[in-house]
Amino acid sequence: MPAAIHPISASGQLCFHESGMFRQDSLIMLKFIIKRICASIPTMLVLITVSFFLMRLAPGSPFTGERNLPPAVMANIEAKYHLNDPMYLQYFHYLKQLAQGDLGPSFKYKDFSVNELLAQSLPVSAELGFYAFLIAAIFGMFIGIIAALKQNSWLDYSLMSGAMTGIVVPSFVMAPVLVLVFAVRLQWLPAGGWNDGGLMNLILPVVTLSIGYVSSIARITRGAMIEVLNSPFIRTARAKGLPMSRIILRHALRPAMLPIVSFLGPAFVGIITGSIVIENVFGIPGVGQLFVNGALNRDYGMILGLTILVGIMTILFNAILDILYAIIDPKIRY
């Protein structure tokens, strides 16, 4: 007669097996994260290199608008900013600055570096972008789920028609319309300004910046959720009598998140670039105003620093999204 297996021994073996599987999954995930971070480094270097040489080779100079500058003064200015060095030396000098966290000088605001100007304006743009991104993700997913649950109903058609309108109308058209309605006619909200990020000053720019991405995320969520709700495992859950709220939250939401996560990277880039227009429309003292002033004054120190900063932020954000994608869908790790 075979010997009986002690229940404690069997339980211990099961725990050991599960612990080993957990360590293996953790190791695979760690390797994936390291691989993704390492893959971002060459992309950053290419971004820095291309941005630097495009700015340096562009026609004009930040000092060509200055009047009656003697050659000796111009030579001193160029020597101060290393502009009379060979191009490759300027490039390596800039890389050395970046390695120390220095984005270089501003040629327009001569008493300030790019870092000092960003320290004042970046928190404003970050607050605006954060709220717009948060609203886009939450409301977009909520509208998409409601539309999927009410598929082919009048509510579905109404929500998707509104979403299509939000997608096709650009923010620089939407902004004056919202100002005209809510600030001029109804006088519910201020037409512009920042006022230290007060709630009333935030509403119009945040809504204007986020409305297109709310619409896009809503349409993506609706399509993904409809596909998941028609899956066999969802039909099985319904047959068991599980409430719809539990089916959505515990079974359908995670697989439906995959295309949404894929879209968040382009949405992040769009919100950053869109904030340039929104900040100038509403008079918000953020990075957008620095970018426009730098472009108008040929301050390529400022433009280069902002381009590299936004590019690096985008690369890092996409790397984070890839890691999040791998957490949601473990097959990506292998």
Q: What kind of feature is each model-predicted range?
A:
Residues L54-A58, E66-P70, A99, F107, ...:
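Hydrophobic aliphatic residues
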